[in-house]
Amino acid sequence: MLRKARRKLIYEKAKHYHKEYRQMYRTEIRMARMARKAGNFYVPAEPKLAFVIRIRGINGVSPKVRKVLQLLRLRQIFNGTFVKLNKASINMLRIVEPYIAWGYPNLKSVNELIYKRGYGKINKKRIALTDNTLIARSLGKYNIICMEDLIHEIYTVGKHFKEANNFLWPFKLSSPRGGMKKKTTHFVEGGDAGNREDQINRLIRRMN
């Protein structure tokens, strides 16, 4: 009976989130349309969420860069993590910019990363998220009891983002299909490093 009730609750939550995401998308489109009509530019809200991928090794790098990569939990090449964007984290990303590719993940990317490559940190071990009970056991006290809750908390950068993000083990991504262009050159100069804004979603597809 308890399991049935839990399943129903999870289903209701998923339905609610789906509606919320649709609403967010519609609002964005409406605002852009209104701005265009009034002859203005629509400036979207500042992104709150980044996905950061380490794209280079760190032989011979300064201790400062090494330390920041550790703080971002990017200990190996092609590791990826979610980062809440604020002044402090943006400064950290600037310090390690030549070693990372980052940008603003969309809902599809967050969804696919967590469903396909999501591992939780349970008793300091890397455990595949095959069951909602694993999530409920670790994050239930924050009302995060299933995959959909976890995705919602990360994507919307909710008030328990830190706990949800720390629960997620850094993502181990594959080497990108088609390879990298130039790891040492910034994205805006035709390379791979640095902020590629929405284009990060393309890179995630190639690595997931």
UniProtKB/Swiss-Prot annotation:
Modified residues (Phosphotyrosine): 99
Main localization (coarse): cytoplasm
InterPro entries: Ribo_uL30_ferredoxin-like_sf, Ribosomal_uL30, Ribosomal_uL30_CS, Ribosomal_uL30_euk, Ribosomal_uL30_euk_arc, Ribosomal_uL30_ferredoxin-like, Ribosomal_uL30_N_euk
Gene Ontology terms, MF aspect: RNA binding; structural constituent of ribosome
Pfam families (alphabetical): Ribosomal_L30, Ribosomal_L30_N
Signal peptide: none
N6-succinyllysine: residues bearing it: 87
Keywords: Acetylation, Cytoplasm, Phosphoprotein, Repeat, Ribonucleoprotein, Ribosomal protein, RNA-binding
N6-acetyllysine, modified sites: 84
Entry-linked NCBIfam families: uL30_euk
SUBUNIT field: Component of the large ribosomal subunit. Homodimer. Interacts with DHX33.
PANTHER family named in the record: 60S RIBOSOMAL PROTEIN L7 (PTHR11524), LARGE RIBOSOMAL SUBUNIT PROTEIN UL30 (PTHR11524:SF12)
Family designation: Belongs to the universal ribosomal protein uL30 family.
Cited function: Component of the large ribosomal subunit. The ribosome is a large ribonucleoprotein complex responsible for the synthesis of proteins in the cell. Binds to G-rich structures in 28S rRNA and in mRNAs. Plays a regulatory role in the translation apparatus; inhibits cell-free translation of mRNAs.
This protein's name: Large ribosomal subunit protein uL30
Organism: Oryctolagus cuniculus
